[in-house]
Amino acid sequence: MSEPEIKVGKTSSALFDRAPMAPSMPGGRASSSHGLSVTDDIDARIWERIKDHPCFSEXAHHYFARMHXXVAPACNIQCNYCNRKYDCTNESCPXVASVKLTPDQALRKVLAVASKVPELSVIXVAGPGDACYDWRKTVATFEGVAREIPDMKLCISTNGLALPDHVDELADMNIDHVTITINMVDPEIGAKIYPWIIHGHRRYTGIAAAGILHERQMLGLELLTKRGILTKINSVMIPGVNDTHLVEVNRWIRDRGAFMHNVVPLISKPSHGTYYGLTGQRCPEPFELKALQDCLDGNIKLMRHCQQCRADAIGLLGDDREREFALDQISTKVEFDTSKREAYRKLVQHERGDQLAAKLDANKAVKSLGSSGTLAVAVATKGGGRINEHFGQARELQVYAVSLKGINLVGHXXVEQYCLGGIGEKATLDHTIVALDGIDILLSSKIGDCPKKRLAETGVRASDA
């Protein structure tokens, strides 16, 4: 019997539409994918736990999708960068959802998505409030998913205030991945970020509130580490508030066993209705974010591919499909078909084998050149270790360091799409040029003469692969 046809995001069942990055680039150098198998800094046991999780593995986010079930609207803290919205379809940032779901509605939606999105590997509760504070709804949702799709990964995102009360239950439910947002370890700084919290049926403000939050976050992280649960720490970079302080946050979480640190830029616009947005708090520039990430690199694994997802996000990172699954368009009885999901997993396994072979060949080719120095190479890719994205359509670029040590993925550069029908192209390209500071070579499937010339003027050699 033939295997079912698989649709992969915007690509076909071939997964990706070009051959793996070949061991040749301008100047005779090579490019390859990194992290497609057991990497140098992750042992085999950890790799097995993260290889299908798009947020905990950079390699996985090209193959696997996540779904956030927006079942937890209640929250126990107020953040100056957050305005929880439950009926918003336009904004793309955390704490925003188009509709609140009951656990039963969420399960129906999960089954519908899993039937049509074979890449789906993770169901998370990330709000729009707090998963641990709105605990009964979170648990009811996870129990339903575990019953219907036993091999689906479950994870939560939390501010950490109520987390210590539920670590044992998380472990009992086989939840292996938890994200905590930690923006400070100094209550004086925390008071500038959090105006109030609710804890023990009491409302606290100012430094007292931030002090309680800090203690609970550290306790929760320590308890998760003791239970062997992988923890990712999200930190919002707020210029002039906690930007330099995040170095200290990084040290604290590393010492308490966090697996990964994800530093994301503040999203702050007046239209969002947040305190920071209304008071004019600026967002960090791309070069400021990169400088901070580079400063932290080496202390702990860094996530550099975060898309700062909505509380109801569905699909591959950067390719949200939530609007395809409006609740009123989903049948009251959904038949979940596992065949497409199983076939897709086989394709990914084969693809990863090809990528590992290509990586080994490319590293050999680079080392045989014998030249010294390191090249920084940015690649426009839809994933799979292939140069298959038009420069003007790219939302992010993978950055590789190419040297005698081999080819290693060192980060991501978030960029805006350049091809917008002639609207704002110059401003967008200016932003991209800033993001490409320090890059020697840009590889894409196609690039126009105008952006190629502008990049050349800044010292970036652009090539159509």
Curated annotation (Swiss-Prot):
The keyword 4Fe-4S applies. Pathway: Cofactor biosynthesis; Fe-Mo cofactor biosynthesis. The gene is fixZ. Coiled coil: none annotated. It is an enzyme of class 4 (lyase). This is FeMo cofactor biosynthesis protein FixZ. [4Fe-4S] cluster 2 binds at residues 306, 309. It comes from the Bacteria. SUPFAM superfamilies: Nitrogenase accessory factor-like, Radical SAM enzymes. Its cofactor is [4Fe-4S] cluster. It comes from Rhizobium leguminosarum. Involved in the biosynthesis of the iron-molybdenum cofactor (FeMo-co or M-cluster) found in the dinitrogenase enzyme of the nitrogenase complex in nitrogen-fixing microorganisms. Catalyzes the crucial step of radical SAM-dependent carbide insertion that occurs concomitant with the insertion of a 9th sulfur and the rearrangement/coupling of two [4Fe-4S] clusters into a [8Fe-9S-C] cluster, the precursor to the M-cluster. Binds 3 [4Fe-4S] clusters per monomer. One cluster is coordinated with 3 cysteines and an exchangeable S-adenosyl-L-methionine. The two others probably act as substrate. S-adenosyl-L-methionine binds at residues 81, 129, 181, 233. Pfam families: Nitro_FeMo-Co, Radical_SAM. Keywords: 4Fe-4S, Iron, Iron-sulfur, Lyase, Metal-binding, Nitrogen fixation, Plasmid, S-adenosyl-L-methionine. GO terms for biological process: nitrogen fixation. Its EC number is 4.-.-.-.
